[in-house]
């Protein structure tokens, strides 16, 4: 099966038999049918052949469910994530299993997922990434996703946590965990270790390497750390001279690096050695659009003092040809301060003891290279050559200035650039070079001088950090590209990809060794392990005879070799190996290599010249004759015969020699792997491009790692997990008290699966893939037998839940009916006919509606003369509310400028109210009605009198806010500080379960908006105090107990923050706690204890010396159309979807009804300033 999403993977169409298609050609484990052919509806799966992926290919896959009408030849699917209407048909071979009831944040190792197909891997990585969990394990790999922001997870405190943990295996994945594992293995087994960090440009390899070194360097401050400081100081130098801004990464490493460190857990980094390879030399002389050359050039030109500028003949950035690419130069980079970085480089040079004359030589060489690029070489007719090279007088001055900086003879260098010497017998015949030959010579000089300068800096660093007597044991860190696939691939990509093939072979050996040790530890036979490595491919690429490298070297040593002839030779000699194919686009100059991860097309155009890119002996002799010690030392020990190319001097040959030496070292170590992923090209935090990540899963062999774990007994779980996974095979057996190992064995024996397909180990069950699939089929058949029973029990259970719900809310419904009767008294409010017609028709209301309110007479609570039935009230509301909702909202804040004058209110309050007796009777009646009131009679009367005075006039939202302020200040002055006021306009607040630490009073009050609409609102007032010291200690212990229930889960995706006036870290922390406790109390609905736990945690963890008590209000329902106002400095309101309410809700809710949620409000009562 050739899947659609793989046809353009990695930028080209796949052959049907390409290696990477095996990840998609695996038989789908989706088994939505029983043996009788019945489809299992609501079965979850992934597919790429769906509307969402067609609209947005970056999604790659969408989650769907199987619906009725599915057959064994095609599945009827409904898309659920992202949601879409309608159904569509897909072939069963075009779907993947989905992992159900799996919380991605709890899955540290994706290898232990029930399904590890590519869709499930993408889903888990995406879910964790969006929750800022960037590290995931795919043993033996650590997958690290670049977050493009600081998550605060690499601080010294994090290092301390991972260094000092007594059980590091219980910690979540992290580069620090990998570094600690390498360090413990080094000291425990006395065996050399290596950490291989790979990924594409911008994936975070450099940052991961720096964090590993920080972990190793975090030793006791009492130990001398001179060498360690030197190694750490070398990082800015290597970055300045080896990193550059590319289109894909602002700080891209353009070289490979292998560091060997002598590390101790107590003394830090003691010695080290650094090897560099594959420096991108061409970047010195040219860059693509929106890219830069190496950072050091820009740092020098921006950060140099006026004295340095004069000393090194520095010009502006725009005046250098080498720094202005094809479409102009790119001088500035967001997030990079070249001046500040130059100061850091100077400090690092001091630490590396590159001072005085050495530092002068380095800067002189850099300036000289830039000036040589400004030398203009022209062509003219001379000595019978129509395009003979010559240098204009103006450029000769520039060349002379550059040679002065390089401390070489300008006349000798000019001659070697322009004059060609040919030795014929004893005579030397001189002739002119062409314009192109001279330009090539200058470019080659610039590239090689910079390359040798970089090598010299590495040697200087090594001379300071090398162990005098060698390192007995070391940890190696390899920082290198993953497989690289570009639009046009040439020699550079061949070298990078061959390196990765060597590393892939080593990786396969490591996985095989790891699996073998696991089988032996569990007592499982290892005969089932059958691995296929890439040894034959490595031989076809790098073998001594009839290999790519051998043919490349022969072609470069040949006299009349051409790129086209070299391409033909490759196909003629190597195509029989099965790893080299003809290109479908250009058979003359292109060929395809069948790499481990994909078929990659290369071009031979210019490949021979690139391989021969070396400095001619004559030019090298000029550089060796330099009077500057550093310039002279750049080419020491390099001998080339004049006019000839010798074996071992070619780029590929030298690279292969260094590569084999490095791989030989790595092969002798115990390897740890870190794969860095780049989630998007725009470098946006939380940006996810599924197709880009999928490419990297292939290029970094992450899917290959998971595929290798499917060999042999691919399904392996401990006994408890196995029994839980397949419990429906025999529920009674699983629920018994028998030993889990015995239960697991009985389940397998009863299934009828051949014993050759499974093994019971010491602590785990090992099952082959086909047998695991058969178990899934059997379990699904068992579950399908329950469908008729579920169809009967489902409605019965919903009926029971509905009755329980009604029993809990019947009291509130009675109160609601009473309030409805009171508000629906006939003739209590008269609205003009024009206004009523506008409200009913949904038209715009008049700006000044004529509203006549009859004054309500309050006798001794006389019963109303006529009461509308509750059914009529509901019918009226259900018709009018949805129709007038939008229009009514416009009148909420008719007069935002209306305010309440506190002083005027207090003066008015001193007067005796005409309804004084009524207010006292009302307060007394409320206290006797079992209202949630715990204030004294005097306070209750005070509250009701204040409310009655303030609500005499029509209201607006602005006025409600001011009323809160006035009531709070009034209560503070009369009854002490720490009073809080909350106003909510919805009747749902009558159903609220509140927990307040202090005196509480709830007021129901009628109000009328300025447009004539009446409403019922609730006002909660309560008085609290600062907690005492002994209470805070009790709360601290309660907070630790509360927070320690479940530390590893993350509820940031469940808990929605609606309003917040707390720091982000506190918002995340408290949201997590609320989500965790909600999982515990959602079925009991004991919101008082729920609120108590939250309050204890807040007081114990976040109370400040001058703050008050934290208060918590929990309410079933949203604060819909409400104005919640409190006077405090720290405040958090969240909403949580309430599945229990959702299940009990009607299938056809009334229009305008909110989604069932639980609202939690947390705020701190702070003492206001005294007037």
UniProtKB/Swiss-Prot annotation:
Q: Where does ATP bind?
A: 199-206
- PROSITE patterns on file: MYOSIN_MOTOR (PS51456)
Q: What is its main location?
A: cytoplasm
Q: Name one Pfam family in it.
A: Myosin_head
Q: Which GO BP terms apply?
A: actin filament organization; microtubule-based process
Q: Which Gene3D superfamilies match?
A: 1.10.10.820, 1.20.5.4820, 1.20.58.530, Kinesin motor domain, Myosin VI head, motor domain, U50 subdomain
The name this protein carries in UniProt is Myosin-B/C
Tell me the organism's taxonomic lineage: Eukaryota, Sar, Alveolata, Apicomplexa, Conoidasida
